[in-house]
Amino acid sequence: QAAHYASPYYNYICYDGLYKESPCHVGGCLWHSFDHQRGYHPDPFYGGLMDVFRQPKYSYYMFKAQRPAVVSESLAESGPMVYIAHEMTPFSSRDVTVYSNCDEVRLTVNKDGQTYTYKKDKTRKGMPSPVITFPGIFDFMVDKKMTREKHDADVYFLAEGLMDGKVVATHKVMPARRAEQIRLRVDNEGIGLRADGSDFVTVVAEITDKNGNVK
């Protein structure tokens, strides 16, 4: 879905394409922010940037990477970001996708493992922050071998976003192991409940392994 909105291989209106239009093109839009019941059709719409419970999907982070990397106090969220769109499961792609608005991204595979680097081409036309792909670097059998050798804590992806040579954003992903707990978290965007009898808040239940990695 994120690739469809960003820059698919087929001919379709996409974010990258809108940025390549002439200056005479005054604007463009894609689709809905949330999954929802269509009303006119029995099948739900699943093209939202968030699901029906307002939990972000990969496409949310792809669009988040299009914001400027500078901090702005006038915005709810701003500044540099980096996000690894990979679950590290036996069925995950060997290619690893990363979204970031930083000038440079370093991706480290496992403790003391190989590091890969991406540098943004500032002369490229199109969307501000293209989707970053590190091809063929995930190998589930390496995870399996390290886990059997009791080194499962050393299996991870670590992405570092750099601006002017300095690390300004990080994101770490580890494979989820055996489910061991249910974790509850309040999704209130930092806004407290109002005790007037009419307010409510979303509580998200997540199944995680013993280290808190979501299954």
Located regions from the model:
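Short beta-turn/strand-loop junction motif enriched in small, turn-promoting residues
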Residues: 15, 191, 209-212
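Extended substrate-binding grooves/exosites of carbohydrate-active enzymes
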Residues: 1-166
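Low-complexity, acidic Ser/Thr/Pro/Gly-rich terminal tails and inter-domain linkers that flank the onset
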Residues: 176-196
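Short, solvent-exposed loop/linker segments at the N-terminal edge
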Residues: 86-92, 190-201
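Active/binding-pocket-proximal capping segment
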Residues: 113-117, 176-179, 215
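Beta-strand-rich structural segments
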Residues: 98-100, 199-214
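Edge beta-strands of extracellular beta-sandwich domains
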Residues: 165-177
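Ordered hydrophobic segments in well-structured contexts
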Residues: 81-83, 97, 158, 172, ...
